[in-house]
């Protein structure tokens, strides 16, 4: 499944109020827009926020993902971040009618593409960013020529976490296919009608035989699909999932071994992830409620 990529960034003040912008249609949404070529989800979110409001905020946590259709009928895939700010002044772009700093409750009373259920779902992540997020301004985003939409093949996966021991453990599966021997978490490509969460849930069950609740997204990436010079792009989102019991039964055609590993053990194995990404993952795992 392919879709045009969108990224957003919700600024959060110390008092818990969030910045929403009123679009010409009258709805109130977090600052967001389409990615430009060469951007990551985070870079696109920072640029869009700055272009639309003049505010600089560092993305500190993914609070929502979405896959659906634009008003034009084109498929869209979006990742929304949150970040702390101490700025109150907003330089509104001509694309918008107004702006407001609102609470979650006030947001739910406004017309919005976000449903009340989806707004309620971000209450926990938003509160975490408000309490522990540091106010950090990123560098000024690079000026990029608007060369049209960025379309990518969509994928998702989940790191299955066991919180029942002395320290958290995560499940890794060893690949049978190239790169043979690499350790990875369950994941794959979206099928028609799926969003990122549904894909992660299905892939987790298909590759482990375990059904688990998909929790927070901890990672999102845009990169060349099959090789560095590939003109086609891949856009993936990684989630956490809580192991609630059941024996791991690896899909035999894809993996030849499975093991539960601690953070220390994870870093000794060859995975898809950089050290920085692994550190972000384990920070998110440690923040999961027992």
Residue ranges and their predicted role:
Residues 117-141, 276-290:
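Charged phosphate-binding loop/patch that engages nucleotide di/tri-phosphates or the phosphate backbone
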Residues 35-58, 66-117, 121, 190-213, ...:
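Unchanged
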Residues 15-17, 71-74, 163-169, 228-231:
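Short, solvent-exposed loop/turn segments that connect beta-strands within catalytic domains
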Residues 3, 26, 75-77, 152, ...:
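Residue-level preference for beta-strand/loop junctions
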Residues 11-13, 22, 85, 160-162, ...:
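Residue-level signal for short segments within beta-strands and strand-turn junctions
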Residues 14-51, 166-206:
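Conserved Nudix-box catalytic region and its N-terminal flanking loop in Nudix hydrolases
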């Amino acid at each position: 499944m392919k879709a045009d990529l969108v990224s957003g960034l919700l600024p959060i003040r110390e008092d818990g109020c969030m910045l929403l912008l009123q679009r010409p249609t009258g709805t109130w949404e977090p600052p967001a827009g389409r990615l430009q070529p060469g951007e990551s989800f985070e870079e696109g979110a920072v640029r869009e926020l700055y272009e639309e409001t003049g505010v600089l905020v560092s993305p500190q946590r993914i609070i929502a993902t979405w896959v659906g259709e634009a008003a034009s009928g084109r498929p869209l895939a979006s990742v929304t971040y949150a970040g702390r700010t101490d700025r109150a002044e907003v330089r509104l772009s001509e694309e918008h009618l107004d702006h407001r700093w609102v609470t979650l409750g006030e947001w739910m009373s406004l017309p919005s593409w976000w449903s009340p259920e989806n707004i309620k779902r971000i209450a926990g992540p938003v509160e975490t960013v408000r309490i522990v997020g540091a106010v950090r301004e990123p560098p000024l985003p690079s000026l990029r020529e608007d060369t049209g939409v960025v379309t990518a093949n969509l994928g998702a996966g989940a790191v299955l976490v066991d919180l029942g021991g002395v320290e958290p453990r995560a499940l890794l599966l060893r690949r049978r296919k190239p790169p043979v021997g690499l350790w990875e978490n369950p994941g794959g490509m979206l099928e028609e009608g799926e969003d990122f969460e549904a894909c992660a849930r299905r892939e987790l069950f298909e590759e482990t035989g375990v059904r688990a609740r998909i929790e927070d997204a901890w990672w999102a990436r845009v990169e060349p699909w099959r090789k560095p010079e590939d003109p086609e792009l891949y856009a993936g989102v990684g989630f956490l999932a809580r192991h609630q019991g059941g024996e791991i039964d690896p899909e035999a055609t894809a993996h030849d071994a499975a093991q539960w590993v601690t953070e220390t053990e994870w870093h000794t194995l060859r995975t898809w992830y950089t050290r920085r990404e692994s550190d972000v993952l384990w920070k998110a795992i440690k923040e999961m409620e027992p």
